[in-house]
Amino acid sequence: MVAGVTRTFKGKIVGKDLTKWGKDAQLDFSAELAKAKASGAEGIFVFYPGKAGGAFIKQYAQAGLQGKIPLYSVFTVDSIALPKLQKANMSGVMGSVMTQFWAPDLDTPQNKKFVSGFKRKYGRYPSFYAAQSYDTIFLIKSAVEAVKGDLSNMDGMRAAMKTANFPSVRGKFSYGNNHFPIQNFYSRKVIKDSEGVWTTSVQEVVL
């Protein structure tokens, strides 16, 4: 993740720290946050899934950086982490930004149906993992229907799946010649919804 940012970021990177992972993972980020504060940086990017993410967000707020140096992350803040962060009242996450190919507030008929049904059944917002799974079922369904239920027609199944002729929660979706998805990526910001639940909202298309 860090290598990707380093390779593609158009601005100037004024500092980089790699912290310890594993059973004895580093959870004290005071030194790194102090360096970031002193560097004059206009943003902080992190990749901290799990408990390290919560620890970093808490210390980021305690260091007085919230509202001063924007926080950007990947696989750190999402619909899986946000309920836990809200329960722990880690408000330092509010206003932070991440990118993803899907968001719960994407304005498509299929996504509205998916999100409302998921919330009704589980009482929370779906994650992008759930969105992927939902899309996958409809993709497979489209292929099965294309071969009229003849699952032995593997070539027909593959050809049908390649067309991606299904209603995606992501909106416009197709495959390239290498079978990688062609899809939008969105900048998403952590907000409170109308009921006070922490979630993310699309800001703009970034890719």
Residue ranges and their predicted role:
Residues 57-134, 145-151, 190-194, 198-207:
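Extracellular/periplasmic periplasmic-binding protein-like sensory domains
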Residues 114-117, 139-143, 160, 186:
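Generic recognition of well-ordered alpha-helical segments
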Residues 162-207:
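Solvent-exposed, acidic/polar segments of extracytosolic/periplasmic ligand-binding ectodomains
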